[in-house]
């Protein structure tokens, strides 16, 4: 890997940026044809550490060995898109048609648990809570330094992650990326126009309409957004106004661990498989935004699962959707109804 | 299938619409795990017509049989996202947070050739020219009636099309979809600011820079956009200002058939496979836009191939990309260099 930072370029036709991570081209590729998500068959911890580069003591493709961790474990991504080197692999350009800027930051992997056979859905509430605390700690540590800290998880080969060890990622950057920038602007505009926080306003109306709400507890509501794109796309919202993850109280975090585990069990039960998904947190930006007014932001957790009809048939983002407009077949209301009615006990327990 | 039109909904967080095609949920699913693209092994025309629902005389999943066509063949999609029924499956809503509109239109399939074993890359120039004339005829026929006529092709199981019979699609709608709308606005803005057509201005600068131009003839230039996202994303541009496909002259269409075939051969040669791609035309909108000034538009043909390292390893759009910002690993300049240097003779001819 070259010792230079990557850069991003601007697409003036559709007003989006794209990161050009020339650093990463030589990284080993572990993925993944589209295949049924499976958990690794029962094996001892010793076998695991040989087989799985994310397990305690496991050796990663970079040759670095993991600590013998017993709870969560955070390490720097061996092939990061964001780095903090002195130089950049590309020069800044500022023309309207040729716009390119250096990107800096850090990319980490967050292992949720030492046991490769567990998932957030099959870990117990106490273990999920530990993951939530790790997320909080990362936001506290990286927020002051970076404009945007993206915590996310790709689960399953069908979304490009073939290692089923329970883990997510964190990418923190010295700039506000395309999508959070859009969310920043739209929430700001909504507040200026209506004097209300967009997603609070939205949650209030959904609470009355009822038809897209799947599950709620005292502090959180899980729903299918009216505008959902992915077949079983959902959003988890705090019931009160919360700008950032780090604004959550202890009780809210405890409550989050409960509803997060419950909703992931429901997901697994849809097709009786370890449901593949992309999951990501969004809240008010950090870094220089910490001293700005971001009160129009509402924290939310998005789930984008690609499966539509079975454990092996993913939704393709193709053709008309990449040239003109996205499309979904299943209505958001039917998706909400399916998820509402599905069992709250994990299917694997019933098979025993 | 219900006899009701579909609708689209607005996502106020990221300013995008999504089509909710509740009509389509019951369509038969022919796709596709990620697999190496293959052509059907040699078989007689009779066998083909039994095996392949897109071949002459073939029976489609709807039970409808194709004509015994000998050149190109256009038919209405049996499970269309756009229809022209009397009623809509959803009521119009116009709230800022709950915005939903009926969509109307037509979806067609365009078979390029009766022979299931050919592709645009392996057809001869005369046969490619016939496809171009069919595209032109469709634009002429549907343009006056619809605001946007999207001609596109998904090629290969990896982009969701498992039927290798040479074919593309056309979706025409009574509204301007999300991405063409963005292109409309950005090109307009560029013209207002610079007094130049954005993509003409861009082509002029790329012609001087040279490093992303792959191939050109008298009327067309094939290049990797500075802001390309897909690993081998490219764009084909007319050398002069052309607003719409139907503005192309006879000589330009002849020239297009030549360069289109040549560039697709290069694509196939990258990994010595029938290269999967999404291909789509964009030009000034039609319908009510035909009487408006759209002179800031430049016609272009985009190619979004998902392969990165081999015939079986696709790029995933996942994780960070769906929550924050798109990323590519290969630089646009290296992609351009690879495509420039690759052979112009189809690999299948060399294997013989
Ligand atoms: Zn992973
Ligand atoms: Zn197809």
From Swiss-Prot, chains A, B:
Any one biological process term the GO annotation gives: galactose catabolic process via UDP-galactose, Leloir pathway
One annotated Gene Ontology cellular component of this protein: cytoplasm
Keyword annotations from UniProtKB, A to Z: Carbohydrate metabolism, Galactose metabolism, Metal-binding, Nucleotidyltransferase, Transferase, Zinc
Cofactor binding mode and count: Binds 1 zinc ion per subunit.
Pfam families, per the entry: GalP_UDP_tr_C (PF02744), GalP_UDP_transf (PF01087)
Pathway assigned in UniProt: Carbohydrate metabolism; galactose metabolism
Zinc listed as a keyword: yes
Name of this protein: Probable galactose-1-phosphate uridylyltransferase
Species, as recorded: Caenorhabditis elegans
């Amino acid at each position: 890997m070259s010792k230079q930072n990557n850069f991003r370029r601007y697409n003036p036709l559709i007003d989006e940026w794209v990161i050009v991570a020339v650093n990463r081209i030589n990284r080993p590729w572990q993925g993944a044809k589209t295949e049924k998500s499976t958990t690794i068959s029962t094996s001892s911890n010793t076998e695991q550490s040989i087989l799985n580069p994310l397990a305690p003591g496991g050796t990663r493709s970079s040759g670095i060995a993991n600590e013998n961790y017993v709870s969560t474990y955070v390490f720097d991504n061996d092939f990061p898109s964001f780095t903090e080197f002195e130089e950049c692999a590309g020069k800044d350009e500022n023309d309207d048609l040729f716009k390119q800027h250096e990107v800096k930051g850090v990319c980490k992997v967050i292992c949720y648990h030492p046991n490769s056979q567990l998932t957030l859905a099959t870990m117990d509430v106490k273990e999920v809570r530990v993951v939530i605390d790790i997320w909080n700690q990362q936001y506290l540590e990286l927020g002051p330094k970076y404009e945007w800290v993206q915590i996310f998880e790709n689960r399953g080969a069908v979304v490009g992650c073939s290692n089923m060890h329970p883990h997510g990622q964190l990418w923190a950057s010295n700039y506000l990326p395309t999508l959070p920038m859009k969310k920043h602007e739209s929430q700001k505009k909504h507040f200026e126009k209506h004097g209300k926080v967009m997603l609070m306003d939205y949650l209030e109306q959904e609470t009355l309409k009822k038809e897209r709400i799947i599950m709620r507890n005292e502090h959180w509501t899980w729903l299918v957004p009216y505008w959902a794109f992915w077949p079983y796309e959902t959003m988890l919202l705090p019931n009160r106004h919360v700008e950032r993850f780090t604004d959550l109280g202890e009780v809210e975090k405890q409550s989050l661990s409960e509803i997060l585990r419950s909703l992931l069990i429901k997901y697994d039960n849809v097709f009786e498989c370890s449901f593949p998904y992309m999951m990501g947190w969004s809240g008010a930006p950090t870094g220089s935004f910490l001293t700005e007014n971001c009160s129009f932001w509402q924290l939310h957790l998005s789930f984008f699962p690609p499966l539509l009809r079975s454990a092996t048939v993913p939704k393709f983002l193709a053709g008309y959707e990449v040239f003109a407009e996205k499309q979904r077949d299943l209505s958001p209301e039917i998706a909400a109804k399916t998820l509402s009615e599905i069992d709250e006990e994990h299917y694997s327990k019933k098979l025993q």
